[in-house]
Amino acid sequence: LLRLHHRFGHRSFQDIQAWSRAGRFNIPIEVSTCKIPICLACKFGDAKKNPHNGATHSVGPANPNPGDFVSVDTLEAGIPGYIPFTNGKPSNRRYTNSTVWVDQASKNIWVDHQETKTGKETLQSKIRYEKYAARYHRELKHIHSDNGIFAKSEFVTHCQANNQTHTFCGVGAHWQNGVVERYIGHLTSRARTMLLHAMRHWPTMITPTFWPYAISHAARIHNHSPRRGQTKSPCELFTDETDSISPNDFHVFGCPVFVLAKELQDGKSMQKSSRARSYMGIYVGQSPHHASNVALIFNPKTQLVSPQYHVVFDEDVETVASSDPAIMESNIALISDQLFQDHEWIHTDDFT
């Protein structure tokens, strides 16, 4: 049960046991009666501030269709994060924040990471989200946001040009945009927990700089896993198509991965006998542009990320040294003090 919990992005034990009882995702029935274990990373990662005063109010139509009503907000990371470059030399460019979109009908999440919090980049996120929705014949009709960057003229003008209505929550009243706020809380909690788990086992390699990968991985697991009480995933509800990805396709975030050398992948012989037949990379999620069994692997030497199929996962992290308390404590302190500090609201709603 604990191993599945790690693989499914620290999904609640109760959800995993419910899937086991329902015979979903090839989870053995014995899992449904396991004693609930303790996950140390969850104990650290789920620590939050006190909830805001007052109730969380839902806005929008009672029974919307996908695209009818979407909420959007900005996630401030607090720590620069890796940009997934696929070629070239290591770069000092980093992501600093993300724009998060939540469709209220399906609870499907769209995340765009950004280098700057500018109107131009935020508008580009909106355009990309609209293209994604249009691919499945969904049209964004109403957008709900807070003020700030979403009140800029270019964003407002683009909404008007596309015949979209646009409403705002009150200044400082984040809970009036409660749907996206609580899902940002969900993503940051899961991402923080995955990072802490990975750093605990591999502190010399995993750092808070991996947060963009962790956020994207958390969103992808959410989108392709049924919510509590649902038989379809948020992705299936939004796209109205059978999901080609299941929780079984995911692996433990940040675990070591052995990638077959390119020559051997191409069916060629190794040019030099002294060269290794594989290299060790870091699992940072599944590729959104390939088959469900193609993983995204971060190469620590080149700092590049690539989709890989011929891989072996070390999900129990048995092939690397995991004992460096000083580095681990430093990273835990950095995550606790700086990462995702602007999004710690607790809502009583069930957002899983």
Regions found by a protein language model. Name each.
Residues L4, I16-W19, C39-C42, D73, ...:
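Mobile genetic element proteins and their domesticated derivatives, centered on retroelements
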Residues L1-L2, H6, R11-F44, K49, ...:
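Retroelement integrase C-terminal DNA-binding domain
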Residues P28-E30, S58-A62, I83-N92, V100, ...:
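Beta-strand elements of modular eukaryotic interaction domains
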Residues F44-E115, K120-T122, D266-M270:
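An active-site-proximal beta-strand-loop segment
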Residues L2-H6, L40, D68-V72, G81-P90, ...:
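Conserved, well-structured core segments
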Residues A218-L264:
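Acidic, glycine-rich loop-and-strand cores that form catalytic or ligand-binding grooves
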Residues G88-N97, V111-H137, Q303-L304, V311-T319:
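Active-site beta-loop-alpha junctions of metal-dependent nucleic acid enzymes
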Residues S145-A161, H166-R192, I206-A219:
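RNase H-like two-metal-ion nuclease catalytic core shared by retroviral integrases
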